[in-house]
Amino acid sequence: MTTKHSRTPGRPRQFDPEQAIETAQHLFHSRGYDAVSVADLTKAFGINPPSFYAAFGSKLGLYTRVLKRYRMTDAIPLGALLRHDRLTAKCLIDVLMEAARRYVADPDATGCLVLEGAHCNDKPAREAACEFYIAAENLIRTYVAMRYPQEADRMTDFMGTLMAGLSAKARAGYSLERLQESVLLAGDVLERLLPD
């Protein structure tokens, strides 16, 4: 008499969309939007393409969800840093220092996900990143305009240029100390132009 051992099938691995978005954020941040394929994403998530498209609609659909997650978890907290009870220049310097710290925090994903995404070749993805970037610029512009309306556009452009430069230098491997030195130089300019 032979005994048959019936093996019950294992429970299928559960797909967690929020975990997938976190994984995708790291992939997009470390490699850039253009360099990450749907095949890379499905492999990282452990799912097949139909499941990917059912969950996210498209690579762009996933990317927009990544940008929303980034805004909530990893973006520079402009609302907390741009305080009305402190000197304008000091708050802007704090934004730059926080940018420098965040841009080098993960050696595998340096720079700013949004600023780097604003340079991708895919037009809809680039527009999604730019929309996020423009919203951040508008917060800075509004903040500066409260005390320095005549300087708001110029200071917003200056901050955007500095943040893009910090992101590029972080991606090029510059240390936090080097980025902070640049922020200190920029801080001298900000304090001179915005003395409150």
Label each region the model flagged.
Residues 91, 104-127:
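Amphipathic alpha-helical segments used for helix-helix packing
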Residues 1-15, 194-196:
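N-terminal intrinsically disordered/low-complexity leader segments
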Residues 19, 23-61, 65:
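Helix-turn-helix
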Residues 110, 116-119, 151-172, 181-189:
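Hydrophobic alpha-helical segments that form the core
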Residues 68-74:
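Short, basic, alpha-helical segments at the C-terminal edge of helix-turn-helix-like DNA-binding modules
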Residues 26, 30, 58, 84, ...:
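Conserved amphipathic alpha-helical interaction elements at protein-protein interfaces in regulatory
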Residues 65, 78-110, 156-159:
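Hydrophobic alpha-helical connector segments
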Residues 75, 90, 94-97, 123-147, ...:
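Amphipathic alpha-helical packing segments from all-alpha helical-bundle domains
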